[in-house]
Amino acid sequence: MKFNQFSYIPVSPETAYQELRSLGFEVSLDASAKANFESFVRKYFLFFEDTDLALKNWIADPETDLLSFFQSDRPLTAEVFGLVALQLLGFVPNVDFTDSVAFLEKMAFPIAFDGSLNNLHQLLATRTQSGNTLIDQLVAQDLIPISNDYVFFNGKSLATFDTNQLHREVVYVETPVDTDKDGLLDLVKVTILRPNVDFPVPAMMTASPYQQGTNEPSSDKLTHKMEGDLLVKPAGKISLSRPEIKAPEADLTPINPVTKAEERFAHTDTYTLNDYMLARGVASIYVSGVGTFNSEGFMTSGDYQQVLAYKAVIDWLNGRARAFTSRSRQHTITADWASGKVTTTGLSYLGTMSNALATTGVDGLEMVIAEAGISSWYDYYRENGLLVSPGGYPGEDLDTLTEFTYSRALLAGEYLRHQKDYEAYLNELSTAIDRKHGDYNQFWHDRNYVQFADRVKATVVFTHGSQDWNVKPINVYQMFRALPKSLEKHLFFHNGAHVYMNAWQSIDFRESMNALICQKLLGLDNGYTLPTVIWQNNQSEQTWEVLDNFGHDNGKHIQLGKSEASIANHYEEEIFAKYGKAYQSFKDDLFMDKANAITLDFELDQDIQINGRVHLELRVKSSTNRGLISAQVLEMGDKKYLAPIPELKRMSLDNGRLFKEEALRELPFKQAKYRVITKGHLNLQNRKDLLSIENVTPNEWMTIGLDLQPTIYKPNKGDKLRLVLYTTDFEHTIRDNSDYEVTVDLSQSKMTLPY
């Protein structure tokens, strides 16, 4: 374990004293450091009446138990403080460590001992080996009582709300859209978990089309075949118009208003970051949206109709939209329990809707936590004029996702009434996505949130993984960079895949979110400042660093060679079938120079931190009138790399007081032969830009530019980078087995590493 403490807020000695005393620690400004430390440690043993016995079972140094130390005349030193602090944090001498000084240094222990009360204050805010901060662990053990009111420590809310006596209610919010065109504005089901209190509370809202269930069997039947020819597209320029996202004014006329919801529930799937804040006084709201189980409308998959339907929930929390107690629309109900302040949460599609909602500029949305979210749906299913499936899901497209999330059809009565119209709508959508050409068009433009980034007013927190080939890093990169310069924004860029990071051992992500939420939603003047970019260093385990930005303008140019080299697109049928059946076998062969590719190795002559988009400038020609180029950059070398999927550790993370406990996680540092740094794909007909389609003349040289997926990665001098240039990618692109070649003039081609 390493300490990476970004949530702690430095305080004055007076504040440290006051907060310690308010929690029941009997420290004194007049007492010695040793006396205060003894009082602090004895308080830790909440379940012991005879704390002498507990102290005898801990040690102050290898020769002295802690009780004997406190009874002696010896002063408190940094060495004793450090050894006892380790035991307070759950580390066991002679098991987890033998040399406490070396162990503390190795773990980057964040507290510089000076004997002050600030040391004890910061120790409470430090994570234990179990993943909980020491103060959260003690509160879970009833250090302070459940009060159903806010208690803050170090600018963060503590788990003082009763999660056994929550309001669990359902309402149906009226949206400004009629997506199924039945003449009625669509209602969306809203599932609410909130503290049982008599004062207004803010809310964490998760907009998830998956929340009420999915239709996987029907979606699987629509999965597209990836084998086929790369078509020649007619040359031309694509024209677009700016989408209109203004909603009509809501009808706020009450209808037989009531103050109590008539529908409740026993269980719903939850997100543990929401659970964590629910125990700390923030309501938790889940909305599936239009076209889902027990909501109305059709699944419009990423357009602003879907977004405005989610926005209506925030409007309802602020008195700007109506909600009904049931879909019969007989009684309206207001959110009289809500303060109106909201943050959105969730990963993938959920993070996508966070991005989209932010671009509406809706009042009340104070903060957005967008984890691995899409910012432009074209960049999820397409790339540079090509069909490019999300990593791990070849053959998926927006129509299959629409079918997957259209859970309204899981209700047999709804299926009976609406399926015919829905299937007609789905056929229109399947045509509009244009799998035939793979081009950007108005359909995709209507699902591009980046163009409205200037409307974002909320504080934005992004998380994204460098190894996320599902929602690829271009999505966070372009949104992060498009936001107004005056806006507060933050990015946690880790080395994982498409994964949550709130339960990781190495970083206090959820505590950082607690501090921000208290500041933005509860109005707490805690002075908290989160760095703009927090990056997980790829060179060692559990190491995080602060960076100034994502994307740098400096570039290191690497000439690719001195000759020409060719890529054969065609494979023997047996090999082609093998790769199509198991794309991982293709990747294994590709990276080991056993597939059809140009493989180039470069030894770095300097340390460098790649930050941004690796750019390829290639002089190429195709033997036919079409073609695609794919590229991947890897670090080669048999050594330890961070694996992309977190390993589960012990079930020790408590989100309240024995509430929604979950497993601690961390990316393992494992031996491997290589690490993918970045990748990219380009249709040669889109070599100028995304909106320009040009002819490819057989055997005529072209100069193309290809920006690969943005990343942050640090190799050292002497490390070997491998650039692989190829055509068909069996995981991502169309699988065209035509017999043609792409030739690259390496002497006129280069790779630029941004830093």
UniProtKB/Swiss-Prot annotation:
The active site is at 348 (charge relay system), 468 (charge relay system), 498 (charge relay system). InterPro entries: AB_hydrolase_fold, Galactose-bd-like_sf, Pept_S15_Xpro, PepX_N_dom, PepX_N_dom_sf, Xaa-Pro-like_dom, Xaa-Pro_dipept_C. It holds the Pfam family PepX_N. It catalyses: Hydrolyzes Xaa-Pro-|- bonds to release unblocked, N-terminal dipeptides from substrates including Ala-Pro-|-p-nitroanilide and (sequentially) Tyr-Pro-|-Phe-Pro-|-Gly-Pro-|-Ile. Its EC number is 3.4.14.11. The keyword Transcription regulation does not apply. Transmembrane segments: none annotated. The keyword Cytoplasm applies. Coiled coil: none annotated. One of its GO terms (cellular component) is cytoplasm. This is Xaa-Pro dipeptidyl-peptidase. It comes from Streptococcus thermophilus.
